[in-house]
Structures are given as structure tokens and as C-alpha cells.
Amino acid sequence: MGFSPKTLVAFCWTVLFIISFVHCLPMTHGGKPGYGIERTIIRPEWRCYVDEGCPKGQGAPCEKNCKNVADYGICIGIKCCCFDVIPVPPT
């Protein structure tokens, strides 16, 4: 028995979906995908500065400015903080 074209197409889409999902996961300090097991803690080497847009809820300029020095940017209160790994808050 062979595989029908419908089965092959479904299999290929499934493989493509799984590969793209794993590829898009945030990276941890060890350089492997973050599956939610390891938690990132706030590190002192974060670079933070006061940003006028953060209190107004405008995080896009913060993200854009941080791309020059790090991977991500996030507004924390009135400060924009740049960092290299997406933080996971402790539960």
C-alpha cells in the first residue's frame, strides 16, 4: 500500500509546522530553545533608561531603540529596558 497524496500533503504540513514552531521559540542562556522549563531572571547587565513613551503605553519606540544594542526592549514603568533574552516572570 502506498500513501495517498492527501496523506503526504498533511504529513509535510505537519512537519513544516513543528519545525517552524521550534525555530521561533525564544533562546535561553544555554543557546537552546526555551521550552518554558528554564526561567530567565532579571540580570544586572540590563540596559535601562527613562523613556517618555513608556508611561503613555508606547512600547514600539523602546523596542526599536533597543535593537541597536540588544535583542529586545520592554517598558518597565517609566523605563525602557534592553536585554538579550525574553524574560519569564517568576510564578
Swiss-Prot record:
Single Gene Ontology BP annotation: defense response to fungus
Signal sequence region: 1-24
Sorted UniProt keywords: Antimicrobial, Disulfide bond, Fungicide, Plant defense, Secreted, Signal
Disulfide bonds listed in the record: C48-C82, C54-C75, C62-C80, C66-C81
GO cellular component, one term: extracellular region
Localization, UniProt: Secreted
Family recorded in the similarity comment: Belongs to the DEFL family.
Record protein name field: Putative defensin-like protein 104
Native organism: Arabidopsis thaliana
